[in-house]
Amino acid sequence: MTEAGRRGDAIGTGQLAIVGLFVTALVTAQLTAAKVLQFGLPFSLPVTGDALVLPGAALAYALTFFGSDCYAELYGKRPAQRLVNVGFVMNFVMLALVYSTIAAPAARSSVDPQQFRTVLGASTNIVVGSLLAYLVSQNWDVIAFHKIREWTDGDHLWARNVGSTASSQAIDTVIFVSVAFAVLPELGVNPELGLPTGVLLSLMVGQYVFKLLVAVFDTPFVYAVVGYLRSRGHVASRPRTAD
């Protein structure tokens, strides 16, 4: 194989790896969103107290922003927007597959159908809240990422990675928690999921603090991925203008 052929294979593999990570993290987030996690802290914070409370999807979902930021940096604004929109459609594919499996008749030797439904069948509140939060926050992430790139003339990748993710994660957190656990229960959709205002704020703050920490600590990995793939010929060495 020629050098050009090897470089072309590397480009294809690297791009597919980012897309694969993005979609895998996104689907995992949907499947783990119903579990609420609680991590004890050695100190007390305003609102959250001595524990961080957050949805089980927080880690997986934070990885989607890592993937989309790498993709936006390497391939541009419009390809990143297409990645986000394809991911949105894949959510519906995943939900269709899960709910069709739940609806299908179970063999006698199978796991209990009700347990299966409980584990994999996310409530309407979780589905609607997460899809709406995804659509708004991920598109904002791409827009903010490229605006910051324009302002910094292509320098300071850390600023656009942290800045775009911090703002988009705030949007995502507020939309998801408020829709799933306040707005829809108030409208009569699974009212048992409704949470008091204090708990809602604690859930929002805990989730956002965790996501913000992930955004800060994943910055060296963004540099590593972008640097490696640029060295393999994925893009011009340092883009100076947004698409």
Give each language-model segment a name.
Residues 1-20, 229-243:
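Haloarchaeal acidic low-complexity proteome signature biased toward cell-envelope/secretome components but also
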Residues 2-6, 66-78, 222:
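C-terminal ends of transmembrane helices
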Residues 23-39:
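Alpha-helical transmembrane segments of multi-pass membrane proteins
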Residues 27, 31, 69-70, 96, ...:
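Alpha-helical transmembrane segments of multipass membrane proteins
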Residues 81-83, 87-94, 100-137, 147-148, ...:
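Membrane-embedded alpha-helical bundles of multi-pass transporters/translocases
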